[in-house]
Amino acid sequence: MQIGVVMGGVSTEKEISNLTGKYIIENLDKSKYEILPIPINTKFELIDKIKCLEFAFIALHGNFGEDGKVQALLETMGVPYSGSGVLASSLCMDKNMSKKILQGEGIKTPRWIMLYKNEDIDFESIKNIGYPLVVKPNSGGSSIGITIVKKEQELIKAIEEAFKFDEEILIEEYIKGEEITCCMLDGKPLPILSIKTKEEFFNYKAKYFEGVAEEKVADLSLELKDQVEKISNKCWKSFKLKVYGRIDMIIKGNEVYVIEINTLPGMTKYSLFPKSAKAYGLNFSELLDKIIELSIKEYEF
């Protein structure tokens, strides 16, 4: 089978996408697949590069990759692809919409308000959230543009930083607790990972540089483990996720807060998903086989 690994892209996460793509190419079984690297530098070249593919393994992150646009293009052209569909990708990329759905499903998520570029800032609502708080772009990932603001004097600088990456940003309640992630494969939870970082939070540096964060199987009580898995399953169904995904959470006391849902989790050497799969008993090559197998079943045109 011919597998095109679509990588690069046009978002701020291009560098990470290239790392993901490279690691996927290195670990795909060469005896099973004819592997074609598909580097993307502009939106327009994608159509020519993917039209003859038997299968597209999407290694893109951020806008025009993780937001449903590439998925829609592939579906239109009849090319099967890895991961979730158009709707799930679009919803999970929009943190504001995601949080509204989480709220509607009775799943805890930090309180938040939205700010829009070139509109007045609602300082009173921000004050009601309280400090410390988190300022982040509404779309995008890899923790790019995120700042933890401890006091009011730091707020404007953090807002300006987030607006460099998006026209819409979130001001979010800061939840101090244990950072965990639940990777899902075919709708089933893999071992839950606990994240301990030397940084202030699980930021870009902690995610992609060796030795900055320690991720290991979480030592949770049976009750908490069950709660996390139930929440993850509910997220999977509510957002119509397919094949694989990752739900990032924080545990505070006995309460679990969903921070965000990733439809195309990072697949670099240091990424969480391969580590969780390894703890389950799947090496990276086997994980890639499983993603391809499940995706083809899911997207039969």
UniProtKB/Swiss-Prot annotation:
Annotated residues for binding of Mg(2+) 2: E260, N262
* Pfam families listed in its UniProt record: Dala_Dala_lig_C (PF07478), Dala_Dala_lig_N (PF01820)
The cofactor note from the UniProt entry for this protein is: Binds 2 magnesium or manganese ions per subunit.
Query: Binding positions for ATP?
Result: 126-181
Task: Report the superkingdom from the record.
Answer: Bacteria
Return the SUPFAM superfamilies for the record: Glutathione synthetase ATP-binding domain-like (SSF56059), PreATP-grasp domain (SSF52440)
The pathway to which it is assigned is: Cell wall biogenesis; peptidoglycan biosynthesis
Question: Can you tell me which family this protein belongs to?
Answer: Belongs to the D-alanine--D-alanine ligase family.
Known function: Cell wall formation.
What's the protein here called?
Answer: D-alanine--D-alanine ligase A
